[in-house]
Amino acid sequence: MSKKIFIAFGHNRYKPGSSFNAAVRDTFIDEAKKIGHEIDLINIYDEKQIKFWDGGKPDEQILDYRKRLEQSDIMMIMSPCHNYIMNSATENFIANVFTPPWAFKYKKLFRNYGYPIPNSLKDKTAIISMTYGGPNFVYSAIFQQIPRRIKKMVFSGLCGMKVEYLRFYEVLPDMPQKIFEKHMEKVRKTVQQL
């Protein structure tokens, strides 16, 4: 069954062939189109810069992103991981787009205590794609728990989305071709399982 996939690509090297992340994005898109999925791509660094979130009302740019997300079955957000978070442009995108009451509402129980109720994105799928420069064991055992769990709290805990991960380790400029191809095959398999 054909699905609509919204991709928010957060890397300053977004042109084809310019980065490992761009290769992941392009492989994902090529495989998705072969299967018959529809792609809605934004390159965050190629878009008008989003203002820092200030708690105010969303502007037309944010409302457009939200409309496109509502029309999609799957959202994929891609970014390298720097200092235990996604890069600042991607984090700012998340902070501005996934806010209440659009993404979730709060059910008040007592005073300031309550819980989130998913809204516009409930039961959609979120694929979180992050790349790390460090080795798999160190990051998977210790460090990557921080960004992975925070994003899961946002997309699953608050927004009610089903979360899947696409993680890559030891993403360095001198990556051997064999490892690169192994990563691209992982991307293709992820798309085939959607």
Where does each model-flagged region fall?
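N-terminal beta1-alpha1 ligand-phosphate binding loop
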Residues: S2-I35
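N-terminal beta-loop-helix "entrance" segment that forms/cooperates
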Residues: L41-E60, K178
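A short, flexible beta-alpha/helix-coil linker loop
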Residues: H11-Y14, E47, Y132-F137, E170-D174
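Glycine-rich phosphate/pyrophosphate-binding loop and the adjoining helix
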Residues: F137-L194
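Helix-loop-strand module that forms the ligand-binding subsite of alpha/beta enzymes
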Residues: K57-K152
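A structural preference for short, hydrophobic beta-strand core positions in alpha/beta folds
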Residues: D40-N43, Y165-R167
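Short hydrophobic segments within beta-strands
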Residues: A8-G10, I42, S129-T131
